[in-house]
């Protein structure tokens, strides 16, 4: 589980952080609660945040990751929508409103969520859940930026022979 920082901020830093929460945005596909179906936490209830965009174009991929006008938020009360792009502050508020259901993790997925590493660096500290990051593992420099904020990394490495793409690493 992710440690909670108890450092105090100066009023100037608090103001700058609030401004960043409004100005830092990302396009979101959907937010939903479901049972994790892969990896070491299979069978646990996770809250899923699916972000737009991917740096790969795997021939077999069926995941919607194109930008959409609205992000779908699926709850027990039905579906609501957020206008894209969504700010870190608004998204944190939506995610933290799911606290009425006991989730083990916030699973951040895509597409490729590390395309939004700067956004995630601001968002994750505002979330009241440990983070399970699903990634294709190709954006390792971006991962360095947020690795200390993430509890679990699930890297789904794609082999060139299965994707039809060129090798990612030498």
Name each model feature, range by range.
Residues 26-90:
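Canonical Radical SAM [4Fe-4S] cluster-binding loop centered on the CxxxCxxC motif
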Residues 37-38, 94-97, 141-144:
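Short, flexible, glycine/charge-rich loop motifs used to bind or transfer phosphoryl groups or to couple energy/partner
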Residues 103-105, 110, 114-170:
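Conserved AdoMet/S-adenosylmethionine-binding subsite of the radical SAM
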Residues 2-10:
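Low-acidity, Ser/Thr- and Arg-rich intrinsically disordered low-complexity segments
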Residues 66-78, 85-99, 105-107, 111-132:
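N-terminal active-site wall of soluble small-molecule enzyme domains
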């Amino acid at each position: 589980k992710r440690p909670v920082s108890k450092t105090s901020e100066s009023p100037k830093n608090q103001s700058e952080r609030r401004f960043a929460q409004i100005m830092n945005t990302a396009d979101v596909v959907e937010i939903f609660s479901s049972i994790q179906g892969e990896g070491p936490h299979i069978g646990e209830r996770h809250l899923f945040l699916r972000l737009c965009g991917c740096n790969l174009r795997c021939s077999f991929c069926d995941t919607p990751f194109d930008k959409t006008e609205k992000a779908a938020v699926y709850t027990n009360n039905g579906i609501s929508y957020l206008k894209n792009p969504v700010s870190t502050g608004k998204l944190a508020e939506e995610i933290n409103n799911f606290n009425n259901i006991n989730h083990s993790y916030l699973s951040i997925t895509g597409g490729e969520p590390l395309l939004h590493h700067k956004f995630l660096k601001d968002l994750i500290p505002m979330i009241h859940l440990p983070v399970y990051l699903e990634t294709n593992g190709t954006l390792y420099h971006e991962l360095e930026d947020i690795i200390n904020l993430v509890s679990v990394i699930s890297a789904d490495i794609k082999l060139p022979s299965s994707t039809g793409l060129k090798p990612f690493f030498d």
